[in-house]
């Protein structure tokens, strides 16, 4: 899952990429991706994100089967969406979409673990988040540390995929070197196909730990399914001030959302917890469950698990 060549500055070429299970590094040329270390800090305020129109209808049929047996929910998928996609390869993502052949298992009866498991480790992406009901995986963390492929590589500062030019299409998705199409942020075209009514919660997928994933909306009173449905808000915000880095070992410049670490979680700021979820009733779980929410604002796709993630969503050697 599990990249992309963008032009670069000051004579350097660098590569943007996300991650996949067997090889989280999508960089085919072994070049550094971060802007010239030692650049003026004002450069870090240039937050450039470009997405490509979704004007291509794939000829490959989408495959998604779900079965339940004992304590396991099993998906058989090919990672091909049923919605239109961007043009791949493109000038920032040199890979073509191809069908995968995957069988994925998650816990049918998940339990909260008592501690959070991050999708990103100190060495890079550790897990993909989950799978949508069209068989495409949600994989929000990019393998884009500060100083990548240099002695200053620093995953304490990792580029936010949706805020940088990674060759994403209008559904915030792009393609791995192995051909796997995957979402880094709100899967716009998929949500359009779900066509969620404004007054209903709509299940959009399952997280790697087995808990359900909904898009944006939930009951205004978490445990009352007769209460008004509203757009649920994340409890993250941009930090104020400037990054503490020196521009060599870590980035400097004003916090502007270019890096994941430009954001901070503030308990109670919104409706959702640090994992971008909450406990409450849903149409599928009238007695209540923990559930995650994909929001249009950061973090979009959640960055933590409250339960124990399936090994089928593990990325790379982390």
What are these regions (language model features)?
Residues 133-171, 246-278:
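Short, flexible domain-boundary/linker segments around small modular repeats
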Residues 209-211, 216-317:
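Extended, compositionally biased non-globular segments
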Residues 15-18:
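C-terminal motif of bacterial Sec signal peptides marking the signal peptidase cleavage site
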Residues 106, 132-136, 177-190, 285-299:
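Extracellular/lumenal glycan-associated surfaces
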Residues 156, 161-195:
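Aromatic- and glycine-enriched beta-alpha-beta binding-site module
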Residues 22-165:
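Solvent-exposed N-terminal domain segments of exported/luminal and surface proteins
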Residues 101-103, 126-128, 168, 178-182, ...:
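Extracellular structured ligand-interaction cores
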Residues 2-10:
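Sec-dependent signal peptide recognition
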């Amino acid at each position: 899952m599990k990249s992309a060549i963008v032009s670069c500055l000051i004579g350097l070429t660098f590569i943007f990429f996300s991650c996949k299970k067997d090889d989280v590094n999508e960089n085919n040329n072994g070049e550094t991706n971060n802007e010239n270390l030692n650049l003026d800090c004002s450069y870090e305020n240039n937050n450039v994100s470009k997405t490509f129109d979704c004007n291509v209808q794939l000829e490959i049929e989408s495959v998604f089967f779900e079965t339940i047996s004992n304590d396991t929910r099993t998906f058989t998928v090919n990672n091909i969406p049923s919605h239109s996609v961007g043009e791949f390869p493109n000038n920032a993502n040199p890979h073509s979409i191809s069908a995968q052949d995957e069988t994925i298992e998650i816990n049918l009866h998940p339990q909260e673990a008592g501690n959070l498991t991050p999708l990103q480790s100190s060495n890079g992406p550790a897990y993909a988040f989950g799978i949508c009901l069209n068989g495409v995986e949600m994989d929000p963390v990019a393998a884009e540390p500060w100083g990548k492929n240099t002695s200053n590589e620093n995953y304490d500062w990792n580029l936010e995929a949706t805020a940088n030019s990674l060759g994403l299409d209008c559904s915030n998705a792009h393609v791995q070197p192995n051909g796997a199409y995957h979402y880094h942020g709100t899967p716009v075209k998929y949500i359009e196909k779900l066509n969620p009514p404004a007054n209903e919660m709509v299940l959009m997928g399952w997280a790697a730990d087995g808990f359900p994933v909904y898009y944006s909306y939930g009951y205004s009173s978490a445990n009352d399914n007769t209460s008004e449905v509203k757009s649920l808000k994340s409890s993250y915000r941009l930090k104020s001030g400037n990054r503490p880095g020196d521009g060599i070992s870590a980035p400097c410049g004003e916090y502007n959302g270019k890096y994941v670490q430009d954001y901070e979680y503030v308990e109670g700021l919104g409706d959702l917890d640090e994992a971008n979820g909450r406990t409450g009733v849903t149409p599928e779980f009238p007695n209540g469950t923990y559930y995650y929410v994909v929001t249009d604002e950061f973090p979009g796709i959640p960055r933590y698990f409250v339960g124990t993630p399936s090994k089928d969503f593990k990325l790379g050697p982390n």
